[in-house]
Amino acid sequence: MRSIFYFALAFAALTCSNASAALPNPDETRLLSDTFTKRSLRVAGQEAARGEEIVRVTAQSTNKIFKRPAEKDMSKLIAAAKKALLEKKMAKLSKVIKKPAK
């Protein structure tokens, strides 16, 4: 089991060194990893590391898409939820009543 681990470790080390040796400029490996980091941060929506401007733009765009629950009238939401729960219970009861007894 230990030999498999050492083999995998050696393979990973050789792969990384060969990939960096294949590029003519050794600094390009660092640039490629920086680009990957930026892309992964964009996907996660965590561009806060680049500055306050990006955070504000991101926050404004999400506020346009989704309204915050605090801005909505919560009493209407609670009433709608209670109504949906009551309808669900009534549907269950109607299924039980309609089943023929064997």
From Swiss-Prot:
Keyword Signal among UniProt keywords: yes
Annotated compartments: Secreted; Host cytoplasm; Host nucleus, Host nucleolus; Host nucleus
Induction (record text): Expression is induced during host plant infection.
RxLR-dEER, short sequence motif: residues: 39-53
Region forming the signal peptide: 1-21
Keywords for this protein: Host cytoplasm, Host nucleus, Secreted, Signal, Virulence
Highest taxon of source: Eukaryota
Major subcellular site: secreted
One GO term describing the cellular component: host cell nucleolus
Subunit-level organization: Interacts with host KRBP1.
Membership in a protein family: Belongs to the RxLR effector family.
UniProt note: domains: The RxLR-dEER motif acts to carry the protein into the host cell cytoplasm through binding to cell surface phosphatidylinositol-3-phosphate.
Described function: Effector that enhances P.infestans colonization of host plant leaves. During the early stages of P.infestans infection, interacts with and stabilizes host potato K-homology (KH) RNA-binding protein KRBP1, leading to its accumulation.
Protein name (Swiss-Prot/TrEMBL): RxLR effector protein PexRD41
Gene that encodes the chain: PexRD41
